[in-house]
Each structure stands twice: as structure tokens, then as C-alpha cells.
UniProtKB/Swiss-Prot annotation:
The active site is at R155, K179, H246, R249, H272, Y281. Residues 1-93 form the Core-binding (CB) domain. The gene is xerC. This is Tyrosine recombinase XerC. It comes from the Bacteria. One of its GO terms (molecular function) is DNA binding. It comes from Neisseria gonorrhoeae (strain ATCC 700825 / FA 1090). One of its GO terms (biological process) is cell division. It holds the Pfam family Phage_int_SAM_1.
């Protein structure tokens, strides 16, 4: 049975990526994707899946992908799962437990390019400039959280992981631990500094006292709690539009890129390893870019001007 061979090193692999510093979220995702693969391979006829890692072929993995596709999974999800499988196979090959990686030449399903949704700048300014009840610690906390979310473009996981000593208000920057434990420094807006100065004296602290954003009991806000606070705020004061932490980050990236035209700087601020990841934000507002072109390019001006 393939699980006796291919899956025999599963626990050792997970222990290895934990040692490499992968986040709990990433490790859990790899675990789910690989356990799903093992289950799919176990369901295949014996002639389709071998008993030891060397017996596995490209056909086994394409068959597993095909079954997942038949369940209605989209291309992006299938590509992510294939990536997890490929990394496990590469780890086995590196340790001499497989002769070759059978996933190496499998192309991930083609994914339609998705342009991120950005919130209107005027709407965000209006929402963030709403009066804050200084006597309500949670309202003061949420205002600081939302200012930081839009003002510095942090991922919800990064905000969740912030400690109070990661924030340097006098210098107006924040120390962020991003994907893959990568460290970066991100500037704080004047509005964020002001909101954090109002919040920090009211902050509830648990025994260790490290977390920047905490609940009533002083414990660190979870990613889900942060998301729900944002949704509640938008529902209460907004116009009914859906708002998520991811949209706040997209808005930061798009608005900053429109103003600066410096894609490399935006890449650094967002913590993107690849410039191609940042380039999708160049498609956020083609009308805005077209207007800049009309105003700036000498050949774009009308003859009667």
C-alpha cells in the first residue's frame, strides 16, 4: 500500500519544516494537503499507485489532481495543493528516499488572473475620520487597529503577531514579522501614530503583556477576531459594502502605487518576495493610469490644446 511507503516520512517532514521556521498556519495547511493526497492515493487501484516512494509516477499525481478537480476545486486551490505535494517529494529526493520527483514536470492548472478589489480612498478616509469614543477602550483599540491596517498595509496574520515593543512611535515605524519569518520595517502614518498613542495607555495585558492588540481579558486578538471587528465596524458605520483585512491591504498597495509610481518600494513595504506578486496592483485602476498618461505624455495631448 502506498501509504506504507510514501507517507512513512510524513511526520519527519513536518518536524523539519517546523524547525525551518514555518508558521503554524503553513504547517497545518501542508498537513491537510498531504493527508488528502495520501487518502487519494490509497483509493487508487494497486496498479495505479506503488507501494514505496520509488513506485509512484507522474500518473499517480495527475490522477489525484483530476479527482480533486472533479470535486469542483478551482485552479488556485489545485495549484496550492500541487505545490505542497511537490515540496514533500523534493524533500524525499534530497534525502535519497525517492530517485526522482514525479511531480517535477506537472504544470499547475491555469489560473485566471484576479485583480484585487480596492476600497475607494474617499470612503476609507471618511470611515477612519469618524469620531471615536475615547471612553470606550475597545473603540479606541479598533480605531488604532484599522489605522494601522490601512496605513501600513499589514497582513492580518502580521497584525495578530505584533507585540507592543514592535512599535516605535517616536521614529514612526513598526517591526513586522511576515511570511516565512521574514523581518521588515514599515513606516507608520501620522494618523496611525496618533491612534496608537491613544490606545496604548488603555491596552489590557495578560500575564506576559506582550501582545499589541488584546481583548477584554488581556489576551492576544486572534486573526478571526480582528476580521470580525473590521466587518462589524464597516457594517455599523459604512454603506453595506463588504470589507476584509485583505481588501484593506489591497487598498494600501493600490493607493500607494498610484501616488508614488514606485513598484519596488511598494514591494518592500508589502513584504513580497517576488516583484510579480506586486505587479498585480498595477491593474487596480487603469482609468487613473490612463488619465496620468493623457496629462503627461506629449503625444497624448489634443492638437487644439
Amino acid at each position: 500500500m502506498v501509504l506504507d511507503g510514501f507517507a512513512a516520512y510524513f511526520d519527519a517532514y513536518l518536524e523539519n519544516i517546523v524547525r525551518e521556521g514555518k508558521s503554524e498556519h503553513t504547517v497545518a495547511a501542508y498537513r491537510r494537503d498531504l493527508e488528502e493526497l495520501f487518502a487519494l492515493l490509497a483509493q487508487m487501484p494497486s496498479e495505479d499507485a506503488g507501494g514505496v516512494p520509488q513506485d509512484l509516477s507522474r500518473r499517480d499525481f495527475t490522477a489525484a489532481l483530476r479527482r480533486l478537480s472533479q470535486r469542483g476545486l478551482d485552479g488556485r486551490t489545485l495549484a496550492r495543493k500541487l505545490s505542497a505535494w511537490r515540496q514533500y517529494c523534493a524533500w524525499l529526493v534530497k534525502r535519497g528516499l525517492m530517485r526522482a520527483d514525479p511531480t517535477a514536470d506537472i504544470k499547475p492548472p491555469k489560473q485566471p488572473e484576479r485583480v484585487p478589489k480596492a476600497l475607494p480612498q474617499e470612503w476609507l478616509n471618511r470611515m477612519l475620520d469618524l469620531p471615536v469614543d475615547g471612553g470606550d477602550p475597545l473603540a479606541v483599540r479598533d480605531h488604532a487597529l484599522f489605522e494601522l491596517m490601512y496605513g501600513s498595509g499589514l497582513r492580518v496574520s502580521e497584525i495578530h503577531g505584533l507585540n507592543a515593543d514592535d512599535v516605535y512611535l517616536d521614529e514612526a515605524w513598526v517591526h513586522v514579522t511576515g511570511k516565512g519569518r521574514k523581518q521588515r520595517q514599515v513606516p507608520l502614518t501620522g494618523k496611525s501614530v496618533e491612534a496608537l498613542k491613544n490606545y496604548l495607555p488603555l491596552r489590557q495585558t495578560a500575564s506576559d503583556g506582550k501582545a499589541l492588540f488584546t481583548g477584554r481579558n488581556g489576551t492576544r486578538l486572534s486573526q478571526r477576531q480582528i476580521q470580525k471587528r473590521l466587518e462589524s465596524w464597516a457594517a455599523q458605520y459604512g454603506d453595506g459594502r463588504h470589507v476584509s483585512p485583505h481588501m484593506m491591504r489591497h487598498s494600501y498597495a493600490g493607493h500607494l502605487l498610484q501616488a508614488s509610481r514606485d513598484i519596488r518600494a511598494v514591494q518592500e513595504l508589502l513584504g513580497h518576495s517576488s516583484l510579480s506578486t506586486t505587479q498585480i496592483y498595477t491593474k487596480l485602476d487603469f482609468d487613473h493610469i490612463a488619465r496620468l498618461y493623457d496629462e503627461a505624455h506629449p503625444r497624448a495631448k489634443r492638437q487644439d490644446e
